[in-house]
Amino acid sequence: IQQGLSVMGHCSELEQDLIRALSTRHSAEARDAADPASLNMGNSPELNVAFAEAMAPLYEKYAGNLDVTAIYVEALMNLKAWQLWDKNPATGEITPADDNTLLLVDILEDAFQSSDEAKVHPALCHLYCHALELSPFPEKALPAADVLRTRMPGLGHLVHMPSHIDAWVGQWKEAIDCNIAAVEADDRYVEITGNESQFYKFYRMHNHHFVVWCAMFDGQYET
């Protein structure tokens, strides 16, 4: 971000706007000004809020730009990461955690309805799977999941992502298949790049674990 800020004069208007928005979340100044007690690996609620607020006008300004849409949706999701939906333990009823959940789902679905390109946009499909996997209707994300099965075969995490929906709708075979493909994609990536970072190892292990978990539910002992 510091480098981006230093060369903004050579960037397009869109690029400048995105750099400024990202600087509210990732710049050294923003990090230094954040409450140290809330920082977790550079992450904090106040920085996430600042970024989401900075992206809101850009979503309006660049209406129809699918990349901007994806960045805004992700910014909204990070306000309540993995807590977009609440489940009542007594009744099992699942409801949106807050209005931001409804907003980001509406934004994604508006994009899909407005543009055929959006329906195959990797980031939008990825985010839609995450947005609905713990919702009352994960099956609505099946078309997005199906896109990700083959859209970017070299990116292990995206190859794996359909299983986040498959598992909730009982498509165990499909979940197993896409995770095996994801493991193979990860292996190819490591062979080509030599990247063995601990963070990437976690993602690789997640795919292996998903294969075992889904095979267990499907009774596929040999898998």
Predicted features along the sequence, with ranges:
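Amphipathic alpha-helical repeat scaffolds of TPR domains
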Residues: 9-37, 63-89, 117-132, 153-156, ...
